[in-house]
Amino acid sequence: SALPESAIARFLMTLQIGVVMDPIESINVKKDTTLAMLLAAQQKGWSVQYMTQPDLYSHEGVSRAKVRALTVEDNPEDWFKYGADKDIELNELDVILMRKDPPFDLDYIYSTYLLEQAHLSGTLVVNNPQSLRDCNEKIFATQFPQCCPALLVSANPGRLKAFHLEHKDVIYKPLDGMGGSSIFRAKPEEANLSVIIETLTQHGRRQIMAQRFIPDIINGDKRILMIDGVPVPYALARIPATGESRGNLAAGGNGVAQPLSDQDLWICQQVSSALKEKGLLFVGLDVIGDYLTEINVTSPTCIREIDAAYNLNIAGDLMDTIEQKIALKAR
């Protein structure tokens, strides 16, 4: 039955939010997007329950976890305090943020099964656990060919070499890397082409991606954040270190915030409805020049850097969106 608005307002002030993340003691406080989210949730008066992947379990068909109450502050010396731990059914939580960083491995997939059971029983899981499994960061982008550079996904060394012959300057990358690991650029005269392809494909067994090199990388690999299909109007351009062809901050890139271009907005428009449909509430697009190269759904970052440059509160906007979704269900 419909609750009166005053009751809904009271309910929204007491939400229980869970977070599945890497150990909080080892985060980089200044840059951590998950911390920004937890600070924003706490700002709303919500109580935070913390868990790592191994804390999740299922008993007699019900997903549960050992959780710890958590309070956070924006202090690089002292950013979190644990409260009591307890054992709960996941559906006692109103919302769960799945913020475990890749690798996207079997343990990650098992976690999504456990979270999916909670999602189906009424807890809002961000992002939708099924979509976390369905949307590989590199391959998902290929569903929008109008936005992408020339690319190929293949395990076949001959086909991958032919792509190099056609495009001359090519980036080869694994489909599961993070932070720019194992990304190779093969220029026209690359002597090690066969070795690069053999290594990445494990001698023709593993699918990898080949992508025409985009010279615009010198102006940065832009990270564009989207909240429920709506872009944040500023991007973080990660400028590669001198002599590097990878802009990732983890690979030594340097971040510069800037407004979205018309082409950026067009790309956002192309992908928006698919993101909403799939329950991907918080997503990071990677755009180089005019091209979409990746759609990051597992645990996109860069909130803190864009917030600082333009005095925004992106995590606050995300929490507002989550709150609206929960209010809609309560009504």
Q: What name fits each language-model region?
A:
Residues 1-12:
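N-terminal amphipathic/basic-hydrophobic helices that include classical n-h-c signal peptides
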